[in-house]
Structures are given as structure tokens and as C-alpha cells.
Amino acid sequence: MAERPAPLFLVVDPGASPDPNVPPGSYAAVGEAGRRRLAIELSRRFGSVGAGVASLHPARPPAGETFHWGRWFTAAARSVLARVRAEGRPLNALGYAGAGALALADDALLAALAAPIPGEAVGNNRFSTDAFMFAAEPSGPLGMDAALAALESCSTDNAAMRCLEAAGFASRDLANATWARFDVDTPLDLALLRLAIRLPGTRRPDGLVAAFLEMASLPGGRGLELPHLQRVGAVLRDPEAQLVVAGRIPSAAWSYLETESACRVRCFIEERGMRSARDAVPHSLLADWTERLGPADLVKELASLGDAVILDSRVIMAARAGSSDASAWPPAEERFASDFLDATPVATAWLAELTAAAAESEVPFLLGGHALVSDGLRILVDAAWLGR
């Protein structure tokens, strides 16, 4: 029997093509440096479970052009395939991982991701994919060309699993595995990661990543610390308190929050899967509120409903921009500063108002993206009980 060829992952490496527009010492620079270290670690860990790795250079579309993930990924994949085949080596299992994907995943999860059977795709999250692998059939309609054709039409990596399903591949979703959904996209996500690795039972990163998380310095000399962590933790432990959470909250995260925290929880769930439904126009009641009554009024209203607020601000950004593409939102540096309640660098008027109001609120606010309101909720709950 012929030996089964090793699977190959294409892993995004931010360091392969650094963004020249990111100034040193900025929030974005910290995020890029952290994700590069995570990509290096993930590549090494894929190798430890028997998978090959090739680096993907981040795409930088010309000004005015929208990034299309599928065309970028499949061009790189076909180039790698041509090189492998020219060397006479077989390859029938191909995968992808973002630089910050699977940062807390254990080796068993990585091994499961790297082991699709022919005609199957395995992903970390069917509805918001950050890492996946498919295995092509040696003959028939589910070959390598069919898979790449399906992925080429996919505008975002978050929709990759559903694109492969539409092409006929069976789907195996690992989203219910512990920490499968945790993905580092932002400096605030790095702060969540730093908190998570201090919790019992979580995987400890290698020395390169761990040292960075401890030594990284944000603008103003701050470390990777979540704003109001102690105050939010006190609310989570208090049966008389109420927590308000708004955004793309997965059912598993909501369930964990309900069962493992002591407080009452009020959830406003909007636009789950908006990044994988790139062609749909996002809509949000909270965004409508900011447009009709102003961002500061939204902060005031949310604060009146509970003793702490956790807000997925990207839903508001997407709805106000009429697009789930981050290139249409306020610039990355402004988004990242807002997450740390720093309104000073925020030039977008509505976001500056929202950020300043949240920072000045008597009720503690946490602002962020999808990681904050998904696996980030579990991190916050577990940390609260440990008094971290």
C-alpha cells in the first residue's frame, strides 16, 4: 500500500511581508508582531502532528480594490501544488490557517484538523472559519481542482467551509472542541490570550510567544491588559449583578456564560456569521441607535441595563459602513485604540464619541471583536473565579 502523503497547510505569515504603513509602537504594530509569533508557533506545531507547512504572504490589494480571499489563496495554493508535483511528490490534502488561528488549541485538535478523509473538509468553525483542511478524492468530482475552484469563488476565509460544502465535500466541524474558535486578530485578542494562558488547563505557548505577551508595550507604555478586568470579574461573580453582552455571541459562549457565571445576563445577539456572508449588507439595531440618537446615548442606555457591558463593536462598524469588509470600517489603528478605550487616536467621529463615552461611563465597558464575545467570554468567566 502506498504511503499516504503528508497534509500541507498554508499558514499566513505577517512577517513575510510587513505592512510598511504600520508605524512602530502603534497598536497595529503590536498586533502584527504578536500574530507573526503565533504563526511561527502554529507552523511548528502543525509539523509536530505530521503536516507540512508553507508560508502565505499577506495580501496588500492596491488602493481602491477590495481584497478577495479566494483568488489570493487559490493562486498561492496552485503555485505550491505545481512545485510539489514538479518534484514528483503526491499531495491530496491541503489546508489553510490564519496567523492568529488556534492559538489555544491543543495538539489533539490540530491532529484532528489535519486528518480529513478523501472527500471531506475539516474546519475549526463552520460559520466563521479561521483554519481548515480538505482531502481530495483520487478520482471523481471531489478532486483537487474542484476544491480549489470552490474556494476561488469564496470572498472570505470565514466562508471557506461552506464553499467546500456547496461543492459537495462532506463537512466536519470542530467548533465544539475547547478553544477551537479562539482566533487572534487584534491587540485586545492578544490581551485575552495573555489572560487565558494563566488559567488552569489551558495550553502554554512556547517561549517566543509567552515572552512577547509579557513584554509587549502598547501606546502610552501600557501592557497587554484588558480594561476594567477586575470590575468585570466582580460583576461575573455577583448573583445580584447583571452583565450586558451585545454582538456575534455563539450559542456555546452564551450557554457557558449563563451556567458558569453567578450574575444575570442580558444578551443582544446580532449579525452572527456576517464575515462569512460577505455579500449580505449587515444590519444592527445598536448601529441604528448610534445613527439616530448618537453613540454616547447608546453607551448611556446600555449602561442603564446592567452593571458591566461587553460590546462587539465590529457589528456597529459593519452596519454603519454597509459592509462586513473591514476595509470599509474605521482604520485598524482606530479600531484597536478603541478596544483599549483610548479615544485620542480615533479620528472617525462616531467611533471617537462611542469610545470616549465608554471610557467615561460609571459602568465598566469592554469593547472588541468576535474573539471577545465568543471564547473570550469563557476566558473572562474562568478568570473571574480565580480572581485574575
Regions found by a protein language model. Give the residues of each.
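Conserved alpha/beta core of the MobA/IspD/sugar-nucleotide pyrophosphorylase nucleotidyltransferase superfamily
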Residues: 155-388
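Active-site-proximal specificity loops/subdomain of glycosyltransferases
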Residues: 54-87
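Conserved donor-nucleotide/metal-binding helix-loop-beta segment in metal-dependent transferases, i.e.
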Residues: 101-128
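Short, glycine-/small-residue-rich phosphate/pyrophosphate-handling segment
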Residues: 118-122, 137-167
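Short loop/turn segments at strand-loop or loop-helix junctions that form parts
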Residues: 9-17, 58-59, 126, 134-137, ...
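Short beta-strand-to-loop acidic/aromatic patch adjacent to the donor-nucleotide binding site
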Residues: 90-100
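A short, N-terminal amphipathic alpha-helix
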Residues: 34-51
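N-terminal nucleotide-binding beta1-loop-alpha1 segment
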Residues: 1-21, 382
